[in-house]
């Protein structure tokens, strides 16, 4: 990384002073790829998944053979982020029981597991003292979150915020996305807050998945996957935007990887993944070159989202060396035409 950073800075010195162009950047979703064995095969109906904090574990719900009930929770591991998933392991009878256990959410430290059950609308909690210890028996999540109409939880990267879907009093429609916070991972959850009218509508919103930097929230609105963005963790959420992932709806259960490079979701009783890539051809001339680097230099230190392309695909809120590093990785590449705006 040090070598890459040094090279990027060297290129920056080269391009300073050159004329800048018009910025025109964003990020795109790649064509979806269906997951195959050992994670999914025909006849195995998934129902939600989530990544561990390091991205090396995938927790998911499935009716695959070897389970104890209708749908069980499983975990698959991999050696590296670019490695294939290994054979899934059932979480066992301490977690899985009668009915169907669905929509798992694993805490960043790996010691708390939240999930739903089709028998009711209650979030259940299993805990363990270490990653090598067995899971405790499930217990209902206590109020103020657990009121009997909550589902589809997801943790923030620090484990101090919990996003979930609920039709409790105060919703704007049939079901809204709420968030609750806690001071430490040992403290109880505070009174939940509705994410507001920019996110929640008169329809139904659910299946939240928060990015590791806390700046992008993916979720379901109707039968499509949508997202909302904010400048930082203390800012308000922007109006929801359709992700426009290639393929026919319905699409459900989005799960963003910790590095923001891929989105998992479900459609047609199968699990799929779509890559997320920043558009590095900033001036739209289909070539990444010094003109694009000049655009970054011209916007250096600003919060111009059109030039903010790193380290996450949607940037980090400021145009700086992280964006230059990402651009340098694609220098002199030819790019396809920009996608047509919806």
Task: Please report, for each region that a protein language model flagged, where it lies by residue.
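Cellulosome-associated attachment modules in secreted, modular CAZymes
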Residues: 277-342
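Generic detector of short alpha-helix boundary/capping microenvironments
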Residues: 13-14, 43, 92, 196, ...
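Short, conserved micro-motifs composed of acidic
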Residues: 22-278
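Bacterial N-terminal signal peptides
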Residues: 9-19
């Amino acid at each position: 990384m040090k070598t890459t950073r040094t090279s990027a800075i060297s290129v920056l010195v080269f391009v300073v002073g050159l004329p800048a162009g018009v910025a025109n950047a964003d990020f795109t979703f790649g064509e979806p790829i269906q997951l195959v064995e050992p994670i999914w095969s025909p006849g195995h109906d998934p129902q939600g998944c989530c990544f561990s904090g390091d991205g090396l574990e995938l927790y998911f719900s499935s009716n695959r053979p070897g389970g104890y009930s209708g749908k069980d929770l499983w975990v698959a591991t991999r050696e590296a982020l670019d490695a294939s998933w290994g054979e899934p392991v059932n979480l066992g009878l301490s977690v899985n029981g009668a009915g169907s256990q669905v929509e798992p959410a694993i805490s960043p430290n790996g010691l708390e597991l939240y999930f739903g059950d089709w028998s009711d609308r209650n979030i259940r909690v299993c805990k363990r003292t270490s990653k090598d210890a067995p899971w405790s028996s499930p217990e209902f999540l206590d109020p103020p979150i657990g009121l009997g109409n909550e589902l589809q939880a997801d943790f923030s990267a620090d484990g101090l915020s919990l996003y979930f879907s609920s039709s409790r009093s105060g919703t704007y429609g049939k079901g809204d996305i709420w968030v609750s916070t806690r001071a430490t991972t040992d403290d109880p959850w505070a009174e939940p807050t509705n994410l507001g009218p920019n996110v929640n509508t008169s329809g139904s919103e659910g299946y939240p998945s928060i990015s590791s930097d806390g700046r992008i929230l993916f979720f379901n609105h109707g039968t499509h996957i949508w997202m909302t963005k904010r400048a930082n963790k203390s800012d308000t959420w922007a109006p929801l935007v359709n992700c426009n992932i290639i393929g026919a709806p319905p699409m459900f259960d989005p799960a963003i990887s910790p590095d923001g490079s891929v989105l998992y979701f479900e459609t047609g009783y199968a699990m799929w993944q779509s890559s997320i890539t920043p558009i590095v051809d900033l001036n739209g001339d289909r070539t990444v070159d010094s003109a694009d680097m000049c655009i970054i230099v011209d916007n250096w230190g600003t919060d111009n989202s059109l030039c903010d392309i790193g380290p996450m695909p949607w940037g980090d809120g400021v145009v700086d060396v992280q964006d230059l590093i990402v651009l340098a990785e694609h220098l002199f590449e030819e790019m396809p035409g920009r996608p047509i705006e919806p």
